[in-house]
Regions:
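Long, well-structured alpha-helical subdomains associated
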Residues: 6-7, 43-46, 91-122
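Active-site scaffold of zinc-dependent metalloenzymes
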Residues: 1-48, 59, 63
Length: 122
């Protein structure tokens, strides 16, 4: 589903307000890094809007000293909690910006399945 450029850029502006640069690149994985960059395709889809908001959720935790990036890489139990936190931040952000949430649950469910790789999570 397509959203307007204006709505998508509202989300991107939140990252910029937090001191994080949004880099548009469809050849790289959607991600946040501790150099304060989020990479996302320049495509105005609801899926990309959800993904961008999720990465901003990581930024929020990082700037509030609530995300240990090294632990995120090496501890699957920690990662699951960090991912859930980012999704909660994303939901609140999207709701505040009045981005449609009718595909939110199915999107998040499909992404969360990737984090539950047992026995690594236990």
């Amino acid at each position: 589903m397509i959203i307007s450029r204006e709505k998508f850029m509202k989300i991107a502006n939140v990252a910029e307000e937090l001191g994080c640069k949004v880099v548009y690149d469809s050849t790289k994985k959607i991600s946040f890094n501790t150099r304060m960059y989020i990479t996302v395709p320049y495509e105005f889809t609801l899926e990309n809007a959800y993904a961008l908001a999720h990465e901003i959720g990581h930024v929020i935790d990082y700037v509030n000293d609530e995300l240990d990036h090294d632990k995120w890489f090496h501890d699957w139990s920690y990662r699951v909690n960090a991912e859930m936190s980012a999704w909660v931040h994303a939901y609140k952000l999207l709701e505040k910006l009045e981005i449609p949430l009718h595909h939110w649950q199915s999107h998040v469910n499909s992404k969360l399945a990737n984090y539950f790789i047992l026995p690594k999570v236990i």
